[in-house]
């Protein structure tokens, strides 16, 4: 099968590991991915679940596609990188995140930003880990 995605992403590495033929895109919109999927140029788009969920919701009337809610792999988290010289900023950011989590602001931002999904809470999905350390 042909998997669509951006070069060198972990998603394309997973597709390659699973035996897909890679169709690599460079800086294109979701519209291009979806059009190629519908036209048969590709068979699947391998990408971040939440980003794809939003993309499909945005174009559902334009393209007959659907996200497979039953396939998950390789969970990830986001980090902030601070200069070691700026401990004060790190402390302020950590406090702000803690406060926003406590008062529900992070959940509201998440639901607004991720098509109604609360990404601040761990999912109940048992993610399989696919080792891609050997994939170029």
Region annotations inferred by a language model:
Residues 37, 43-45, 80, 93, ...:
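Residue-level signal for nonpolar/aromatic packing positions in well-ordered secondary structure
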Residues 14-15, 32-41, 77-79:
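Short, charged, surface-exposed secondary-structure boundary motifs
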Residues 1-2, 42-43, 96:
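Short active-site oxyanion
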Residues 10-18, 23, 95-136:
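Ligand-binding clefts/hinges and TM-proximal coupling segments of bilobed small-molecule sensing domains
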Residues 59-95, 116-136:
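Periplasmic-binding protein-like
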Residues 1-34, 49-53:
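Bilobed "Venus flytrap"/periplasmic-binding protein-like clamshell domains
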Residues 13, 43-74:
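A ligand-binding cleft/hinge motif common to bilobed small-molecule-binding domains
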């Amino acid at each position: 099968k042909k998997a669509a995605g951006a070069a060198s992403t972990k998603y394309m590495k997973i597709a390659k590991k699973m035996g897909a033929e890679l169709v690599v895109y460079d800086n294109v919109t979701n519209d291009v991915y979806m059009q190629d999927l519908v036209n048969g140029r590709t068979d699947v788009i391998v990408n971040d679940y939440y980003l794809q969920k939003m993309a499909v919701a945005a174009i559902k009337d334009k393209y007959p596609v659907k996200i497979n809610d039953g396939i998950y792999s390789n969970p990830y988290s986001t980090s902030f990188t601070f200069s070691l010289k700026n401990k004060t900023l790190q402390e302020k950011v950590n406090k702000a995140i803690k406060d926003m989590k406590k008062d529900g602001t992070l959940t509201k931002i998440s639901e607004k930003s991720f098509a109604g999904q609360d990404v601040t809470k761990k999912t109940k999905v048992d993610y399989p880990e696919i080792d891609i350390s050997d994939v170029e």
